[in-house]
Amino acid sequence: MLFRSIALITPDSERTFATHLGAAIELTGDDLNSDQFDDYDLLYLEGYLINNKELVEKACDLARKAGMEIALDLASYNVVETHLEDFSYIISKYVDILFANEEEARAYTGQDTEKAMEKISEQVQITVIKTGSQGSLVKRKEELIKIDAVPVKCVDTTGAGDLYAAGFLYGYLNDQPLSKCGAMGSLLASNVIDLMGARIPDSRWPEIKNKVSDIINR
């Protein structure tokens, strides 16, 4: 069975996940080989995979040998609390870009958002902390950028983090400055939180692509 997750949405539009890892927990490092990492620039890891640390470490080793950068999303504060030691090892050894929301950053560092940003930045090249309706914070070395959220009526936050990361990494892999990467992340996230479900409808993508072009060209 493949990975499945049930999203339970509360009246405040927040979500709680009931997750079954399925085949992701059955795979081993032997299922990966260097050919699978050829011709890619970046490996994106979902934090739930830390339940299979052997697989994560093998993927990171192969990605590094292939010259790839590695991005990680912490996924869930309770997953971070349960696997704190493993996360610390993987992040400090392999991760270049780390995505977290405020709860996840607090679970990882034991600090509030500002101090968490500083602590995480000692381990990775780029730190991104998503701050809900306040937007997000992006830090690289001494550069700290505040990214505004795109104002929309929030219905369901499921998928917001994944879409933010997708937009951010699209900008990053196309050599955009971090401010524009964050703006693309906010744009995509805003297009999934104003409706139920974790996918942006196909009908919205033409307008989204136009807005991404506007961000790049401004």
Q: What do these predicted regions represent?
A:
Residues 1-42, 209-218:
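Conserved N-terminal subdomain of the carbohydrate kinase-like
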Residues 5, 69, 97, 125-126:
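Proline-centered loop/turn at the N-terminus of a beta-strand
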Residues 21-24, 75-77, 150-153:
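Short, acidic/turn-prone active-site loops that include or flank metal/cofactor-
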Residues 27-28, 81-82, 108, 154-158:
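Short, charged, surface-exposed secondary-structure boundary motifs
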Residues 38-39, 93-94, 123:
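Alpha-helix C-terminal capping/helix-to-coil transition sites in glycosyltransferase folds
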Residues 42-118, 134-135:
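Conserved beta-alpha-beta core of the PfkB/ribokinase-like small-molecule kinase fold
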Residues 61, 85, 113-218:
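Conserved phosphate-binding/catalytic region of the ribokinase-like
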